[in-house]
Every structure is written in structure tokens, then in C-alpha cells.
Amino acid sequence: MKITVIGGGSSYTPELLEGIIGEQGLLGVSEIWLVDVPQGQEKLSIMEKLAGRMIRKAGLPIKLTATLDRRAAIKDASYVITQIRVGQLEMRRSDEYISLKHGVIGQETTGAGGFMKALRTIPVLLDICRDIEELAPDAWLLNFTNPAGLVTEAILKHSNVKVVGLCNNPINYYKKFSQTYNVDMEDISLTFVGINHLIWITELHVKGESRIEDILTGVSDSYEARNIPSFGWDLDFLQSLRAIPCGYHKYYYQTDRLLEQQLEQYRQNETRADQVRKVEKQLFDLYQDPSLDEKPQALEQRGGAYYSEAAVRLMTSLHADSRDIHTLNVRNDGAISCLPEDACIEVNCVVESHRVTPLQVGYVPPQIRGLLQVVKAYEELTVEAAVTGDKGVALQALTLHPLIPSAEKAKAVLEEMLEANRHYLPSFYQDIQGVNQ
């Protein structure tokens, strides 16, 4: 089995390698290819050395190759994993600072920041998909690249690649509740409804017994993501919502508090992008230590805990045709009746070797349906804008987003973001050649 990691120089790669090494008995991996772009060559070289040490420590006969040749890396792969950041951290910082300059939330996957990241990223992922169609037509593409739902929807609509989008949020809820109730993860059953970074948990069962009231009444806590401020939830709100919101809901349900905090960080030149840049530097300093031959615990500060476990569990299920349940980003196909058939949703799915099938969700109450439909409409328009380069569609997408207060604000943010990202937007600017970075 050949596994190709696009964005192999990512700071997350040791997490992924740890997972693959741990399940080698089930997967039988013969080759791992790490591929990146010239701008990431230094990090790729560091990662190649660390990966080699990890594989040698495990005593496994896995051939490791690091390259800038994406097509060679993709050829005949069984699984392609994408974890790229088009524009590097510099453009993430630009997204945050432009958003906050205009007084709106600046976040990597939500609002104006997620919108701009999607416009930069979708064309590159579709280009990767063309290579997969040609060179590894039977491969599964596991997409971790954010905004994962938007990127996966674009691939579902505009390529023939077998794709599944993944996020580490669902598995973190399983981990949290298994710890809370002191049971194995297999004893926890969760029903998720929504789209990537906008999922609600509508059912929580522990060994078959419903325990969702524990969370809604404050008896037990829910999972709190490391990269999102923790303000807690109002219990009256939770009980009337009748569902457990995910951490990213805070940008919608607690907008004022999060925006106030972000604006203070902006004034101090210390937004999340600045924080991540410092963490990444510390991580790569660690990775260069020739005695390091395992994933350092410091990686958990990066916000990607357990993402490798989600990826490796999915690969083993696909490989073994296990028909077990995973929470994934897939084509709707009627699973959520209030969303379009071709929308990308994040729900529980049955995984077989040849397909991934979403489970029917059933009735979605209006307090969930309202926000879900609006954000999904924004996502539909954003995918269209990314593919066509239509500025009018882009303006409508950004105006529709709940975190953008007016069409005037949307236009001002859009114009500045497009200009700042000109180099990465060949579909919007005909004088720009396509980029793979």
C-alpha cells in the first residue's frame, strides 16, 4: 500500500505518521511519500528526517520518499491525504488582519477568513484531483485541508475523485465523553447533524443510555477545542437548543465576546496566526533534534489532536471493508432533507471499501435548521465563486454569511482580500498563472 501525503512538510505530519505506524499490522503500508511545494522545502526536509527516525524506531520496512514532484508522489497511490495551506501562514495572518481591520471575526475556517482561504485553496485542490484522476484513479482522497467542508464540496462537485473530508472535532467528542463517563470510546454513541465546523450533537448515549441531559443541564462538560476561546454556554440557551453545539458555534452564538477578544489581539499584533507561527517555530526546532524519534507532546498545542487517529481509523475501515461508523464530510444524498442533495455535510456514515454512505438524520428543528441552511447557502456560493472567479457571486457569498453585518462591509472586505490575494487567484485575475503553494 502506498500512502501519499500532500503537504508533507506540515507540522501535523508526525501525528499522522504515529497513527500509520501504530496500525501497520492492519494497513500493511509499503511506501509513504511526503510531497510539498518549493516554499515548504526546508520544512519537508526536516520532516523527512524525523519521519525516517520514527519509522526506524518502529522497525518497519516502510520505504519513505520526500519530493517536490507531486505527480510522482500521486502515481499508483492507494490513499492521498491532503493537508496543505495555500499561501502559508503569511496569508492566514493577512485574512485575520483584514477581517479585524473591518471589525468582523477573523478566523481560519469561519466568516471572511474561511471564505478567503477557500478561494485560495479550492483551485489548487481541484488541480491535485486532476492528477489523481490520471495517475491514481482508484485512490481514496482523504482531505484535511481547511475549510474542509468547502474544499470537499468543491471536489465532490467538480471532480471524479473518491473523496472524504475529515475533521478532528468529532473524534475529540468521543474522547471527551469516554473520559467523562470512564468508558471505552466504543461505548459512546453520538449523532451529529450539520456541516464542517457547524455540527450539533443531537444524541449522546453511553452504553445505550441517553445522557445528553447531563450536558444540557451542566452536570457534565462538553469538549472544548484548544484553538477556540472557552466562555462556556448559558444553560438556558443549551436546554432550549436541545443539542450540544460544537466549539465553532461560539463564533455565531457568542460573536460579540469573541470579536472583542480578537480585536484586542489585533491591536497587540497577536492574533491566532501570530500564535500559531510561534508554535510552529518551536515545533520545527524540536523536529530538528536528531535524537527525537517520536511525536512530541508539544504538537497538541497546535490544535490538531487526534486527527491522525481519525485518518488512520478511516483508512483501516476502507481497507478492511468493515462497515463501521465514522463521522465524515460527504455528499448529502438526502441524509439531511433540508439541504441540497449535492451539498457536503458532516454526519455519521457507514464505511465500506468501495463507498461511504451517510446515515439519515431525520427531522432538523428550526433552531438548528435556520443557521445551517444560511451557512450552507454561503458555502454553495463560495464554491461557485472559487471555481468561476465571479466577483459578483463572491460578493453575494460573503454578504450572506451571518458574521458579515452588511453588503457594504462585505464589499469592502472582499475588495481588500482579493487584492491581497491576487497572486493566488488565477480564476479572478486572468494575468495570474495557476499556483500550487
What label would you give each PLM region?
Residues E23-G59:
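Glycine-rich phosphate-binding loop and adjoining beta1-alpha1-beta2 segment
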Residues P14, W140, F144-G208:
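Rossmann-fold dinucleotide-binding core
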Residues N182-Q437:
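Long, compositionally biased stretches enriched for glycine and/or charged residues
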Residues E15-G22, I46-I55, C129, Y174-S178:
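Short, well-ordered amphipathic alpha-helices
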Residues I3-V35:
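N-terminal Rossmann-like dinucleotide-binding module
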Residues K2, S30-E31, K63, W140, ...:
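Residues at the starts of beta-strands that form the adenosine-phosphate
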Residues R53-Y79, R85-V86, I105-A112, P123-A136:
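A structured beta-alpha segment of the ubiquitous adenosine-cofactor-binding alpha/beta core
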Residues E90-K157:
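Rossmann-fold NAD(P)-binding glycine/threonine-rich loop
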